[in-house]
A protein has these predicted regions:
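Active-site cores that bind ATP or allylic diphosphates and position pyrophosphate for catalysis
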Residues: 54-178
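N-terminal Rossmann-like or analogous alpha/beta NTP/dinucleotide-binding catalytic cores
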Residues: 1-77
Length: 178
């Protein structure tokens, strides 16, 4: 269900399957294996300092678990497994990319090999951006709630309602008054 929906959205956005490798993360056991190796050399302090971890702990203190703590290591494994050097990320993922470089360099030193190149952010603009959510507070994304983002699968009417309710600078609007 969900995998097919995501694939349809990728294709609708113009991703060319002849030029792009599309895969299901859970179908690649090497990612989990690399995650384990990287985890064994990730330090608690650096993981606890992760901005995303601290934000999630503040938002939901009753659900602090190892998966949440080590999520940046999984993201690093996703990047490093491909030996990627250019990674399309937003401003909010910059710290995770820095951690991926740290974990990759640590792995290289430990095994005295330059296997993982350093990954860097790829963007078409001069700086990384963070797309704000419709509520004007956090980022736009599925983890921030159904009504805080516009989805490709949203109907035109749903999109219109979401946009009309979106947080703005508070200035008057001349068009689209309910």
């Amino acid at each position: 269900g969900h995998v097919k929906d995501v694939l349809v959205e990728y294709l609708a956005c113009g991703i060319d399957p002849e030029e792009t490798t599309i895969y299901i993360q859970s179908d690649v056991p090497e990612i989990a294996e690399l995650y384990l190796y990287l985890n064994m050399n990730a330090y608690m302090g650096e993981l606890e300092r992760s901005t995303s971890f601290k934000d999630k702990v503040r938002a939901n203190p009753d659900n602090v678990n190892a998966g949440l703590l080590t999520y940046p290591v999984l993201m690093a494994a996703d990047i490093l497994i491909h030996r990627a050097t250019k990674v399309p990320v937003g401003k909010d993922q910059e710290q995770h990319l820095e951690m991926a470089r740290t974990f990759g360099n640590r792995f290289n030193r430990l095994y005295q090999n330059e296997y993982f190149p350093e990954p860097y952010a790829f963007t078409y603009s001069k700086s990384l951006v963070k797309v704000p959510g419709l509520d004007g507070k956090g980022k736009m994304g599925k983890s921030e709630g159904e009504n805080n983002a516009v989805y490709l699968s949203d109907s035109p009417e749903i999109i219109r309602k979401k946009v009309l309710k979106a947080f703005t600078d508070g200035g008057p609007t001349s068009e689209f008054q309910d």
